[in-house]
Curated annotation (Swiss-Prot):
UniProt protein name: Glutamate 5-kinase
Keywords: Amino-acid biosynthesis, ATP-binding, Cytoplasm, Kinase, Nucleotide-binding, Proline biosynthesis, Transferase
InterPro entries: AceGlu_kinase-like_sf (IPR036393), Asp/Glu/Uridylate_kinase (IPR001048), G5K_ProB (IPR041739), Glu/AcGlu_kinase (IPR001057), Glu_5kinase (IPR011529), Glu_5kinase/COase_Synthase (IPR005715), Glutamate_5-kinase_CS (IPR019797), PUA (IPR002478)
One Gene Ontology term, aspect cellular component: cytosol
Originating species: Thermus thermophilus (strain ATCC 27634 / DSM 579 / HB8)
Designated gene of the protein: proB
UniProt record similarity statement: Belongs to the glutamate 5-kinase family.
Reactions listed under catalytic activity: L-glutamate + ATP = L-glutamyl 5-phosphate + ADP
NCBIfam families: proB
Enzyme superclass (EC): transferase
Record flagged with keyword Cytoplasm: yes
Primary location recorded for the protein, binned into one broad class: cytoplasm
Domain PUA residues, every copy: 275-353
């Protein structure tokens, strides 16, 4: 059996296309998902739901047929719809005696180490209490998050947050295909993906893999895979699909994962959104990989992007290969001034010195580490 299919804890993301029908939210679809989750609970598994549908619920409440295009109205509909969405989930799980708990997050909430740890503790407590956490984007305050596919990536970060053994994406597509099945009915599904990176490398604008919805799912699989969590992309409208797939039925597309990261390194490598990039010389790359050293200013060749002290940065080799992710001890403007210099020169250049390292090894996750 594929790794993760027997996981004790899994995150299930339910997309808007699965939850909605011609008249807004599809209550029968929600009931079917609740039935499957309840069956998993009977097996002794823990399930965290990431649910879209707040905007659709708001549209249903107001009798709107067309989704608005301007952001304030989308956010207003999300505010109207979120309590209704939770009420529908409560109704769906009521026959099984399972309580549901609302948790609203944005990806930025997980970028703060203290908020990340608080969210982690709360979700663990909810699972210990036997509740079904239902997580959604906090759409009314998260401007960038109301766009197609973002809950895919949020679900991957939630999977890392709760240390799930599997991420299941319930979608309106059957699987990842070699070609667009709408254009070519003979297009073949891809049952397994060993390297999401390789698929993403070919997901250009003219490639069906590069379309907004599918690319977001690939990015989610990459985020989860980076911290050792495999991903299943499944046709969410199919009755019993989750139970069947977890029993080993060849459904959807299975994305393999790398070796697992733990603790702060999982947070660094899987949950943070790097604000910039540092290009390192070959000596610095060797020092990080072979000696577990910290990154000193002498090893930095180039600074890309703008970031503040304490924010995450991606570390790259001169050839453009990712080396790791770390927390910067200096802002981008400061590193640009001290790059290539010895640590002893920092104070002379800046007029002050926080630390001798640009990134300390304790706050650094290398790509090959596990």
């Amino acid at each position: 059996m594929r790794p993760g299919l027997s996981a004790k804890r899994l995150v299930v993301k339910v997309g808007s296309a699965v939850l909605t029908g011609e008249r807004g939210l599809d209550l029968e679809a929600m009931a079917e998902i609740a039935r499957q989750v309840a069956a998993l609970r009977e097996e002794g598994r823990e399930v965290v739901l990431v649910s879209s549908g707040a905007v659709a619920a708001g549209m249903r409440r107001l009798g709107l047929k067309e989704r608005p295009k301007d952001m304030p109205k989308k956010q207003a509909l999300a505010a109207l719809g979120q309590p209704l969405l939770m009420a529908f989930w409560q109704e769906a799980f009521a026959p099984f005696g399972l309580p549901v708990a609302q948790v609203l997050l944005t990806a930025e909430d997980l970028s703060s180490r203290s908020r990340y740890l608080n969210a982690k503790a709360t979700l663990r407590a909810l699972l210990d209490l036997g509740a079904i956490p239902v997580i959604n984007e906090n759409d009314t305050v998260a401007f960038e998050e109301i766009r197609f596919g973002d809950n895919d990536q949020l679900s991957a970060r939630v999977a890392a947050l709760v240390e799930a053994g599997l991420l299941a994406l319930l979608s309106d597509v059957d699987a990842l295909y070699e070609e667009d099945p709408k254009k070519n009915p003979q297009a073949r599904p891809i049952p397994e993906v060993e390297s999401v990176e390789a698929v993403l490398a070919h997901a250009g604008e003219e490639n069906p893999l590069g379309s907004g919805g599918m690319k977001s799912k690939l990015l989610a699989a990459r985020i989860a895979g980076r911290v050792g969590i495999p991903t299943l992309l499944l046709p969410g409208k199919r009755p019993g699909v989750l139970l069947q797939a977890l029993s080993g039925a060849p459904l959807g597309t299975y994305f393999h994962a790398r070796r697992r990261y733990r603790g702060e390194k999982a947070w660094l490598f899987g949950l943070l959104r790097p604000k910039g990039e540092l290009v390192l010389d070959r000596g610095a790359v060797r020092a990080l990989k072979e000696r577990g050293a910290s990154l000193l200013p002498a090893g930095v060749k180039e600074v890309r992007g703008r970031f503040s002290r304490g924010e995450a940065v991606r570390l790259l080799s001169e050839e453009g290969e990712e080396v790791g992710v770390g927390l910067a001890n200096y802002a981008s403007e400061e590193i640009a001034r001290i790059k290539g210099r010895r640590s002893a020169e920092i104070e002379a250049v800046l007029g002050y010195r926080y630390t001798e390292e640009v990134v300390h090894r304790d706050h650094l996750a290398l790509k090959e580490e596990a």
